[in-house]
């Protein structure tokens, strides 16, 4: 075993003021004109075989996290297809192969802790570890970011920024047409939701239009969603990202562009994204992608009604209902909503529509609560949702989930 710790004599009163505009954007995913509340922490690491014992202090409170390698394969396997989309002068969306994949994002780099919902991408160089990821839930959810190389030389490589995620807790599902459940010959014991992830230009801009930063973020984001499904045992759920498409201009994703309330508007009608998507995906993506069970479009635009996401209950294997939309602002704010929407696709209903309560106590709410609490610090699966997943696994509507590759 070994320990890592490093001190620096540099003034740490306002390290954010030493960031360039680009560095500030890449760390906080916001403009430098925004006043950010953050903590500047020194992380020490003790290695015991494959376990990382990480310690740091925030506002006098000591944190001791035990991080272990991801229990399942990373949601973003090496070699995942990554493409870009651009709206061209011929009034059409063009898809381009980016040929961008990196083994740094595979399962060997992801560490986790189920108890505190920590998902951390670890990079080790010259005996020093750098941590990027998220831990905690709800009001207690925090983002940890390593320093850019220039600041490591000033403060020391073990220093990191930590700030609140401000995760979204509100959701309204868009219900589709109910289809009769047809019993399957055999239940599916393991769900492998194969997802096509689309990053709208509104979100890509938050990452400084940087492909590496975007892919890194998506890796952490969807591994965090996957971790929230870990308590589900019947069937077990393991997400696989089979493709990523990143919009390089505003009109590239027409299902989002045409769902805005007005031209040049930063407001979007969540329900229209789903309605528009039924045509958009059939036209644009069938020739490029066939190995996905559902698409998730991620954008940073607001819905004036407060909706954070939308999809169709039980629609994951349906060619017309396997579309989901989530709002995310680059601070993992959409992790809970993405978990919720995938829960809907796997046939979970709002707990308020079942016999289960949405609220365990003031601090704990269910993941499938229609409107969670802004004060909740933990989310759990209700018995009603777990039963819905199990029942879904026994129908032909879940058949596409049994394989890691869609046939």
From Swiss-Prot:
Disulfide bonds join 317-400, 356-384. The active site is at residue 341. One of its GO terms (molecular function) is toxin activity. GO terms for biological process: membrane protein ectodomain proteolysis. Expressed by the venom gland. Glycans are attached at residues 42, 91, 126, 166, 391. GO terms for cellular component: extracellular region. SUPFAM superfamilies: Metalloproteases ('zincins'), catalytic domain (SSF55486). Its cofactor is Zn(2+). The gelatinase activity is inhibited by EDTA. Residues 191-405 form the Peptidase M12B domain. Zn(2+) binds at residues 340, 344, 350. Its main location: secreted. It is found in: Secreted. Binds 1 zinc ion per subunit. Pfam families: Reprolysin_5. In the C-terminal section; belongs to the venom metalloproteinase (M12B) family. Monomer. The N-terminal section (alone) shows no toxic effect when injected into the host. This section may function in stabilizing the catalytic part of the protein, or in directing it to specific target sites of action. The recombinant protein has gelatinase activity. In vivo, injection of this recombinant into fifth instar L.oleracea (host) larvae results in partial insect mortality associated with the molt to sixth instar, with surviving insects showing retarded development and growth. This is Venom metalloproteinase 3.
């Amino acid at each position: 075993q070994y320990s890592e710790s490093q001190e620096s004599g540099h003034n740490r009163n306002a390290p954010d003021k030493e960031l360039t505009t680009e560095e500030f954007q890449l760390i906080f995913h916001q403009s430098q004109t925004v006043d950010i509340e953050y903590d500047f922490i020194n992380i020490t690491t003790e290695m015991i075989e494959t376990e990382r014992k990480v310690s740091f202090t925030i506002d006098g409170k000591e944190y001791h996290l035990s991080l272990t390698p991801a229990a399942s394969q990373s949601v973003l396997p090496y070699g995942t297809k990554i493409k870009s989309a651009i709206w061209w002068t011929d009034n059409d969306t063009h898809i381009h192969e980016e040929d961008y994949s990196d083994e740094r994002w595979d399962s060997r780099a992801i560490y986790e802790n189920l108890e505190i919902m920590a998902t951390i991408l670890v990079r080790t160089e010259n005996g020093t570890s750098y941590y990027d990821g998220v831990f905690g839930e709800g009001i207690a959810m925090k983002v940890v970011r390593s320093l850019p190389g220039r600041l490591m030389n000033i403060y020391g490589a073990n220093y990191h920024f930590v700030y609140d995620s401000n995760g979204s807790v509100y959701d309204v599902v868009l219900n589709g047409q109910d289809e009769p459940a047809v019993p399957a010959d055999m239940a599916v014991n393991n769900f492998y939701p194969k997802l096509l992830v689309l990053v709208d230009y509104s979100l890509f801009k938050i990452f400084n239009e940087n492909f590496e930063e975007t892919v890194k973020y998506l890796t952490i984001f969807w591994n965090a969603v996957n971790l929230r499904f870990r308590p589900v045992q019947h069937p077990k759920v393991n997400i696989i990202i089979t493709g990523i498409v990143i919009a390089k201009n505003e009109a590239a994703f027409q299902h989002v562009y045409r769902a805005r309330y007005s031209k040049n508007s930063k407001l979007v009608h969540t329900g229209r994204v789903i309605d528009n998507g039924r045509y958009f995906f059939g036209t644009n993506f069938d020739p490029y992608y066939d190995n996905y069970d559902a698409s998730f479009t991620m954008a940073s635009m607001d819905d004036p009604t407060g909706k954070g996401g939308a999809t169709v209950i039980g629609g994951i294997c349906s060619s017309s209902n396997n579309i989901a939309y989530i709002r995310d602002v680059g601070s993992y704010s959409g992790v809970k909503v993405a978990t919720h929407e995938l829960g809907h696709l796997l046939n979970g209903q709002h707990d308020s529509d079942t016999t289960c309560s949405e609220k365990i106590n003031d601090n704990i709410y269910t993941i499938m609560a229609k409107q969670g609490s802004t004060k909740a610090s933990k989310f759990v699966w209700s018995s009603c949702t777990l039963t819905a997943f199990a029942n879904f696994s026994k129908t032909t509507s879940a058949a596409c989930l049994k394989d890691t590759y869609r046939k």
